[in-house]
Amino acid sequence: MHKKNLKKSLIDKAKSLGFDAIGFCEACEVDEETQKFFLSWLDEKCPDYMDYLKKNLDKRFNPTLLLENAKSIIVLSANFFRKSSENRIALYAQSKDYHIVLKEKLKEISTLLEQHGGIQKLCVDTVPIMEKYFAKKAGIGFIGKNTLLISPSAGAFNFLSLIVTTLELEPDSELLDSCENCNRCIQHCPTQALSEYSLNPNLCISALTIEKQTPLNDSEKNLIGEKIFGCDMCLKVCPKSKYFSLPKIPEFQNSFEYDKSKSSLQDFADIAKNTPLERRLKNSTPKI
């Protein structure tokens, strides 16, 4: 099959699986400026409980070290926006664990690549690779001041997944868009964790309630307030995050519901099963 025909088949397959966008870029080394910015952030702001980000930096910056003879990266985006009455839990965590859902879909796309002799590495948020950097290069969206990937299809409400492949596929152009003079995410962050294009995890509700596994100190407890798991403020206030249609992937279309006045910890555990919240319950007991 001609490379252009293969690319079209991949696009059609991705759309049939419910992805909102798919883009292609070269499996190249991350540019020097981005590497320096990330290393500086690690030195100045990365807390001990996120030290995993300091590991495998060579692979994180160079996908050819993740997969020998890697030529291309396929980036896929899935919208997870939907209305929910539960504001104490990040929206992405109110449905089936995206790691499980997206990995199965990537396997289907990988099968198509294998038929053309490709060898692949599937990446769903657990592999050391600069997802947002390559999503930008593949034309999926741009990186906003809230440090998130912002796309035309879902604003900041994106699940990103990547396929690194040994097949050479025609790259797409980067999307020409930006935050311009907008600072809504910075202005509305409840803990002032954001500055332009940089996040301080030591102040971020999401980092404190998701990444930190040890008990919170009094100052951190004051920061998170009534939040249980994550925070969506910088996603919600972004003008690019308009009210889109429901996600095309069925597992992301509905949020779980529970009666706060009657719920017990066991009720909460039952509801959280197979969601990103399940990991939180294994490590500590949230206040519900």
Kindly give the residue locations of the regions a language model identified:
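Short coil/turn linker and secondary-structure boundary residues
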Residues: 1-5, 30, 199, 263, ...
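Auxiliary alpha/beta "docking" domains used to position bulky ligands
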Residues: 1-178
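Generic recognition of stable, solvent-exposed alpha-helical segments in well-folded globular domains
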Residues: 5, 9, 104, 177, ...
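Generic structural signal of hydrophobic/aromatic residues within well-ordered alpha-helices
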Residues: 38, 42, 53, 204, ...
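Alpha-helical scaffold domains
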Residues: 50, 218-288
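Short, small-residue-rich loop/turn micro-motifs
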Residues: 78-80, 208, 272
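Glycine- and acidic-residue-rich phosphate-binding/metal-coordinating active-site segment common to enzymes
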Residues: 173, 214-218
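Iron-sulfur cluster-binding cysteine motifs and their immediate structural context
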Residues: 184-209, 213, 224-252
